[in-house]
Amino acid sequence: MKTLFLAIALFSAVALAEEKSESAELVPGGEAFVVESVNYPEDASANLKQTWKLTTTAGNFIHLECTDIRLFEDKPCGDWALTFDDGGNVTEMCTTSFDHKFTSKTNTLTLTLRTGRDARGFVACKATATKK
């Protein structure tokens, strides 16, 4: 009976996972793209995987300014993390920051926010394209 209950609980947790995805093509000198987690400024949903795929023209970069990152601090990062992938260079953070800046090394940047079984943590940033 315990095994059946555990199997149902695990299946329910997996079945309830939420995935969101957005993409944007940024132009140097153009408008900023707002990156906000689901429910911001409230906590993001539990079991969330939210992805933002940002691109700009070849030879340019993507600059990110985050004014509100609140994730569980853990080493190594656990279930709550924000990942920056700029074409193979992957950085992961799980902390609180009100002034985090990141500039990609390529013309693409993929951000992924993931949350654990509790609805906790959120992210708010602005992305712009910058010339070399």
Swiss-Prot record:
Chain ranges of the CUB domain: 22-129
InterPro entries tied to this protein: CUB_dom, Sperma_CUB_dom_sf
A cellular component annotation (GO) from this entry: extracellular region
Presence of keyword Nucleus: no
Cleaved signal peptide residues: 1-17
Origin: domain of life: Eukaryota
Major location category of this protein: secreted
Free-text tissue specificity from the UniProt record: Expressed by the venom gland (posterior main gland) (at protein level).
Alphabetically ordered keywords of this record: Disulfide bond, Secreted, Signal
Keyword hit for Cell membrane: no
Disulfide bonds listed in the record: 66-125, 77-94
Subcellular location per the Swiss-Prot or TrEMBL entry: Secreted
Family: Belongs to the venom CUB family.
Protein's UniProt name: Venom CUB domain-containing protein 2
Organism (species): Platymeris rhadamanthus (Red spot assassin bug)
